[in-house]
């Protein structure tokens, strides 16, 4: 499939055709990938309104979970998760600011790999946060994720963050597909309850498996990224969102139907079909800011990055001499509720997402027929190590239940 519109699921962008392929799409084509289509997503990557329904967009309607059509797919890469789980393709590209690869991969029973920010170019992708956004592969196996990731990496002059990956990024991650990823590895975990007793029990059972495979489990007493930093990351995203969207609209040329966040807000107000389930508080919040020109932006960015990196994940890994950290990826899929919105219980993806560090989720079991993933995450540029751990876990403890 070629020459498709790029819509973020919005009716405002229904006939919006980019002037160029995204950098990662160019990479895929050059590698011989056959692009068969685009999937639905949570509109505006689940960053339009407070009562949003994951997997719903004005343009595409509601994405349904292949394990139970009344259950949610999570998001924002909702269609990517459902399509790969349902065997409609070998892999899909998801994007994540916080949870949008990991959560839909977990609840749809597949593998999701969120790379370090800067390993994969974002140019051509509709943005939320320049400091957190990334694209990554969503697949049924760790092997497929490793193959796909190697195709996606590369320095792109249109995305300055990719310069940091020079001489670090690999074009082949399959060398990490070995069965020695757990033995002798020090892996940190928290005993703090997820809020779901069945998830806690399943996680504990998988801890026993990790120990059996020779991993050294280390209980950590604090969260790698504090609640304060996690809260402030939302404020940062709101500031970055305005600049990101306005710059994207500008890239579409002078004939673009929507040219600014302000015009997008007006379109939504004038089109009740867009607003029938939830509103657009996040768009209105970002429009009310000065964006990245806000006088507190640089200070806030530094505080969040230091708090999540040097004084967060890096400090935790160093303090406990860890190779990686693990958590349950998220709760099982909830019943879709078009009135009250999403019913998250918890997500394990926040720390790595805010830091811009890599993480990978792999199926660890099922609760009442609904899949749940386990999340491995570590320092920047540690994709190879995480693939090695996840591959060993997957191959020696296969837990993927095929949807019927």
Stretch-by-stretch model annotation:
Residues 1-2, 18, 34-35, 41-44, ...:
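Solvent-exposed loop/turn segments at secondary-structure junctions
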Residues 1-17, 42-46, 162-174, 178, ...:
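Short, well-ordered alpha-helical
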Residues 1-98, 116, 140, 184, ...:
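Gly/Ser-rich catalytic/binding loops embedded in alpha/beta enzyme cores
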Residues 1, 5, 132-134, 161-255:
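Gly/Ser-rich, acidic/histidine-flanked active-site/gating loops
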Residues 1-11, 176-190, 238-309, 361-371:
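Short helix-loop capping/hinge segments that flank enzyme active sites or metal/cofactor-binding pockets
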Residues 30, 34, 85-191, 204-209, ...:
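Structural helix-boundary/capping segments
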Residues 22, 26, 30, 65, ...:
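Solvent-exposed, polar/charged alpha-helical surfaces in well-ordered, non-transmembrane soluble domains
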Residues 30, 34, 89, 284-404:
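Glycine-rich, small-residue loops and helix-cap segments
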């Amino acid at each position: 499939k070629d020459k498709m519109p790029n819509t973020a699921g919005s009716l405002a962008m229904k006939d919006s055709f980019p002037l160029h392929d995204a950098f990662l799409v160019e990479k895929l084509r050059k590698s011989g990938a056959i692009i068969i289509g685009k999937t639905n997503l949570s509109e505006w990557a689940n960053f339009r309104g407070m009562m949003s329904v994951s997997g719903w967009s004005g343009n595409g309607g509601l994405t349904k979970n292949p394990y139970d059509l009344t259950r949610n797919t999570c998001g924002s890469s909702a269609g990517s998760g459902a399509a790969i789980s349902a065997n409609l393709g070998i892999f899909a590209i998801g994007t994540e600011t916080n949870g949008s690869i990991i959560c839909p991969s977990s609840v749809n029973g597949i593998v999701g790999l969120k790379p370090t920010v800067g390993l994969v170019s974002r140019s051509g992708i509709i943005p939320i946060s320049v400091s957190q956004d990334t694209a990554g592969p969503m697949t049924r196996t760790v092997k497929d994720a490793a193959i796909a990731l190697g195709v996606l990496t590369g320095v792109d002059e249109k995305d300055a963050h990719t310069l940091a990956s020079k001489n670090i990024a690999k074009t082949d991650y399959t060398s990490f597909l070995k069965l020695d990823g757990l033995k002798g590895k020090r892996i940190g975990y928290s005993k703090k309850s997820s809020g779901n007793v069945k998830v806690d029990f399943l996680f504990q059972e998988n801890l026993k498996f990790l120990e059996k495979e020779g991993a050294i489990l280390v209980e950590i007493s604090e969260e790698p990224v504090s609640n304060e930093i996690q809260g402030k990351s939302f404020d940062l995203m709101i500031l970055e969102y305005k600049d990101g969207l306005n710059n994207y609209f500008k890239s579409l040329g002078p004939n673009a139907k929507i040219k600014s966040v302000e015009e997008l807000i007006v379109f939504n107000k004038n089109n009740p079909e867009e607003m029938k389930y939830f509103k657009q508080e996040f768009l209105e919040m970002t429009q009310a800011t000065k964006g990245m020109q806000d006088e507190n932006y640089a200070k806030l960015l530094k505080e969040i990055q230091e708090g999540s990196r040097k004084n967060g994940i890096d400090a935790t890994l160093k303090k406990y001499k860890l190779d990686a950290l693990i958590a349950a990826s998220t709760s099982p899929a909830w019943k879709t509720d078009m009135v009250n919105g999403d019913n998250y219980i918890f997500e394990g993806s926040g720390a790595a997402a805010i830091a811009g560090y890599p993480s990978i989720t792999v199926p660890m079991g099922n609760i009442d027929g609904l899949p749940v993933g386990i999340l491995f995450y570590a320092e920047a540029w540690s994709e190879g190590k995480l693939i090695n751990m996840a591959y060993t876990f997957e191959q020696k403890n296969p837990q993927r239940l095929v949807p019927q």
